[in-house]
């Protein structure tokens, strides 16, 4: 979905007003679902959240992404190592809109569809080309929601859901390149 970085809350506000619909606000760096909000033009706190997330125009970036309705059915966290997908699981929001495990999301083992597998092949090539040897990608096919290259997470969750320990495989793939 469209992802718009900006330091100006006014620019983001105009986009929300003109395009309508739901949008996700989040910081460019962060984890665990902290400071991730859904905003809509008619909500009374949308402008205040935009102002806060951009530090009132004082040079702090905010990311705004079109909300993907299908995420209500869950998103898949896919782990990549050495340019290939190595494991995945599904996360579904339970308490609020955030699919982060620490925020109460429910997890389950899952497979990738043929179309998701093809998309992951292309994502793996992209990640390898960018030098990202280990990453987690959140996706709701056909959308890539987020790339997680600093702290991909998910190894423990996959082990708990499937009994498969991917650590050695990931190390081998990362070191092979």
Tell me what each language-model feature is.
Residues 1, 21-22, 60-62, 132, ...:
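A structural micro-motif
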Residues 1-5, 10-13:
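Conserved N-proximal alpha/beta basic substrate-recognition cap immediately N-terminal to
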Residues 4, 79-80, 138:
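Well-ordered beta-strand positions
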Residues 9-10, 19-24, 28-119, 123, ...:
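Phosphate-binding site of ATP-dependent enzymes
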Residues 10-13, 51, 168, 172:
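Amphipathic, non-transmembrane alpha-helical secondary structure
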Residues 94-98, 111-177:
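ATP-dependent carboxylate activation and anion-phosphoryl transfer catalytic cores
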